[in-house]
Amino acid sequence: MPRTHAIEDYRNFGIMAHIDAGKTTTTERILYYTGKSHKIGEVHEGAATMDWMEQEQERGITITSAATTCFWRDKRLNIIDTPGHVDFTIEVERSLRVLDGAVCVLDGNQGVEPQTETVWRQADKYDVPRVVFVNKMDKIGADFFKCVADIIGRVAGKPVCLQLPIGAESSFKGVIDLIKMKAIVWSGEALGANFAEEEIPAELKDQAVEYRTKLVEACVELDDDAMTAYLDGVEPDEDGLRRLVRRAVQLRAFHPVLCGSAFKNKGVQPLLDAVVDYLPSPVDRGAVDGLDFKTEEPVKREPTDEDPFSMLAFKIMDDPHVGTITFCRVYSGKVESGTSVLNSSRDKKERVGRMLLMHANNREDIKEAYAGDIVALAGLKDTRTGDTLCDANKAVILEKMEFPEPVIEIAVEPKSKADQEKLGIALSKLAAEDPSFRVSTDQESGQTILKGMGELHLDIKVDILRRTYKVDANIGQPQVAYREKLTRRQEIDYTHKKQTGGTGQFARVKFVVEPNEPGAGFSFESKIVGGAVPKEYIPGVEKGLNSVLGAGVLAGFPVVDVKVELVDGAYHDVDSSALAFEIASRAAFREALQKGGSVLLEPVMKVEVVSPEEYTGSVIGDLNSRRGQIQGQDMRGNANVINAMVPLANMFGYVNQLRSFSQGRANFTMQFDHYEEVPRGEADKVIAKYA
């Protein structure tokens, strides 16, 4: 099937928001209006619309199905879902990695909230152009201009209004379009389908002129010709203004702000127009960077069907009907179902079996996908989130996604043999779906250990195990994922010698072991010259070192950020072997860690507490008692916002404590920030507990 829409007519965008800002309702209304204007698949207009407006559960699943395709003004919109909760930052990261643009939804009453700040920062990191939709303008306390001020004050954004609200709270009835200089007023209860353009109400005329001038001035600054004309008294016409706003969005020069009430069906069609008019197509975003699979030289892949095929897997889901589904974004070239492609991240061949396009309310089997498409592939065997799939003859590895290390863990013990089998299958599926969720086995106790980004993250995984996979298990208390680190450079010369009649064992290694940069991990280099340790024994050396990394000398926690150089050694023609060098390396490395002043590291969390002012003293006192360091505080509306860095070990059960002394009126968010050395007294307690 040939391409139905030119790549210039694609908009791959996400809707990002704090958890209750109305993201789902906005997405839902977008699907409703786009579904009405285009029959999707074979479903009758009325049936499709009603089906998926009513079946909340189905729709919930569809929207989280990571990508939904719909159409507006003959443009093809691929909406990529981004969750709003801090424990799932990884989900947001991987969505933003494949987006070309975003709509940031704000709650008109709350303005910029903690998760809004987090997703905004991540969008900045990936340079994602965005427009802002101030939602819930019908809500008591809604304040459009406070939201605009928040964008400047809290996320250092550059808001420029394209619309102003007409009325607020229960009297909100429409918006002023500052480009057309018309009022758009919705009427009746026809699910927002009926609206009319009218003259701007007299009492709002001056305000509209003021904000229109701000818009025009922000636009003409980007174009010398437009600026010259403006200084001569000639304003850009409607099309010219739209062109300049589009350019501003692409350059991230400013963020257009619109408003409405998705729940009351007001303002959604103009928002769709803004997506089409201002957010970039894949062509606007340009070529994607990668590395040549063979030479590792930097290469680019252009967003055209003619370039060699490349795509990135950004989400994996388990579907009850189809099995494992891998969501991918095609960056260049085209791919047909039934063909064989290379997973260049793992150097494995994959066969593209079923290829699906996820619509708002159904799945469509497709035979081929082109640059710019977002598709779901069924039945891939070895592909994980962040992997590149490409043409084997022109192989490329696209820029990898970075996944944070887990900071919290719990032990899980199945109650019966049948549960043990179900647990194994379920955990391998969950780990494939979520790269920030890890599973390991404790070597000594044999327990299964689940690791994640926070208490909520692991609670949800346990809930899925019980409800979806019907696994009955005992769950241990959450534990902190401590780390160990060397602090002083060591030179260790170690000889392993064993003679027991017959062939003996002999290996000598000399290491220089020193601390690595924070976050640099483990590195090993052999500096052997002249064959003091033959090449065939080097893998044995590495194996010995790696066996110590998993369990350090203080309390058996993983060792991080250490650099090892093999500088000398000796071998015996008969008695040396890879095993002998493995044993020698293990013993030498442990000795270096013991003598090199190893210390314990703990995860430190960035905590934000939003509390009524009268509880501020209690909140700060409590955080101090948890070894917290207060970073600052400011006012948000009539609430006080306290920012602190607190060790994760002291944050378990915090939610209940905070609720009890604030009578449920304060709330908090936290996310991992960095690892830090544990104070001596605390470290001794931890070592005594685990060693």
Swiss-Prot record:
GO terms for molecular function: GTP binding; GTPase activity; translation elongation factor activity. GO terms for cellular component: cytoplasm. Disulfide bonds: none annotated. Catalyzes the GTP-dependent ribosomal translocation step during translation elongation. During this step, the ribosome changes from the pre-translocational (PRE) to the post-translocational (POST) state as the newly formed A-site-bound peptidyl-tRNA and P-site-bound deacylated tRNA move to the P and E sites, respectively. Catalyzes the coordinated movement of the two tRNA molecules, the mRNA and conformational changes in the ribosome. It holds the Pfam family EFG_IV. InterPro entries: EF-G-like_DII, EFG_II, EFG_III, EFG_III/V, EFG_IV, EFG_V, EFG_V-like, G_TR_CS. Residues 8-283 form the tr-type G domain. It is found in: Cytoplasm. Belongs to the TRAFAC class translation factor GTPase superfamily. Classic translation factor GTPase family. EF-G/EF-2 subfamily. Gene3D superfamilies: 3.30.230.10, 3.30.70.240, Elongation Factor G (Translational Gtpase), domain 3, P-loop containing nucleotide triphosphate hydrolases, Translation factors. Its main location: cytoplasm. This is Elongation factor G.
